[in-house]
Amino acid sequence: MKKAGKKNSDAGKTFILISSSCSSCQKAIEFFDQNKISYVVENFYKKPISDKRFKDILSLSEDGTESLFSKRADQIKATNSVSVEELSISELIKLVRERPSLLRRPIIIQYNSSGIPKRMRIGYNSSEIKVFERKLIEPKPIIQQ
């Protein structure tokens, strides 16, 4: 149970999930640097993606796991005769920890001031990444009278 008043550690942050040798990841970081947008880098090859972060990513995915996994994910089906779509969330998390190269990179996820995931982009696209130049619209508090 969370303590009252304790702020979510993801609140107001943008995370760029990368692998060190990924040129698309470096382009995303350059974009954020050039536009003076703050971010936190998480190298998921060195430190596995947390269960919470992975679930947040899934919650923002418009097409389930399809856009998250690279074409290499087809190898899973060939070797295990099961597709990524058939795996449970816990099985997906285990798979990503064992084989991080299956994920497309970078994964950019942005949280609002309450720590709720609001925006995500997977892969680098020079026009789509510009969405992060805009401020998140925060909900106005409801005032009861």
UniProtKB/Swiss-Prot annotation:
Cysteine-cysteine disulfides: 22-25
InterPro entries listed in its UniProt record: Arsenate_reductase-like, Thioredoxin-like_sf, Tscrpt_reg_Spx/MgsR
Keyword Oxidoreductase tagged: yes
Pfam families (alphabetical): ArsC
Keywords: Disulfide bond, Oxidoreductase, Redox-active center
A single MF term (Gene Ontology): oxidoreductase activity
Domain of life: Bacteria
Tagged with keyword Protein transport: no
PANTHER family assigned to the protein according to its UniProt record, in alphabetical order: ARSENATE REDUCTASE (PTHR30041), GLOBAL TRANSCRIPTIONAL REGULATOR SPX (PTHR30041:SF7)
The family this protein is said to belong to: Belongs to the ArsC family.
Name of this chain's protein: Uncharacterized protein MG127
Organism of derivation: Mycoplasma genitalium (strain ATCC 33530 / DSM 19775 / NCTC 10195 / G37)
Species lineage: Bacteria, Bacillati, Mycoplasmatota, Mycoplasmoidales, Mycoplasmoidaceae
